[in-house]
Amino acid sequence: MMQYDLATMGNHDFDNGIDGFYAQLPHAKFDFVSANYDFKNTILNDIVKPYKIIIKDGIKIGIFGLGVQLDGLVDKKLYKETVYNNPIEVAQDMTRILKEEKKCDLVICLSHLGFKYKDEPEKPSDILLAQKTKNIDLIIGGHTHTFLDKPVIEKNSEGKDVLINQVGCFGLNLGRIDFYLSDNNEVINKGKNIIV
């Protein structure tokens, strides 16, 4: 049976307030990561971590989460003292930690920023995240409910490829992305599929 390894948080996770989200955590059989929401003065402090490292078949995978600006989407009384930090700046720090300090073979961002915003090109999005950072191999996106029939390849700040995928919403579609690594765990190829 398929299961989750990890999830990030988005605006709808606050629909029943931060206390409502906290009350549901015992039902989740996986952890939550969010690097740009600072929960230090909330009940989620020390529960939602900025990143997690998972080892699968000897491959060290660093995964971090990013969430959308809550102000204007969610009533302040629902997210309380949660502080939103610039996701692009936070991502640069996360990738440095995961790739350079922790020596992860793959770095994945679970994003709830949205794919892109035509009318607001400088608003943090998956496209902007890929372009303005380095060391992210894959961005798995949400928020804008964008259905991509195949992942988008965007160049990062060093001119290297970053895969961005978003498969719509409501669990209607599944995405699958395979990374092929050499014997010394360097990415040599990326395979992409969408399962409808």
Features from the language model and the residues they span:
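Acidic, metal/ion-coordinating pockets
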Residues: 1-195
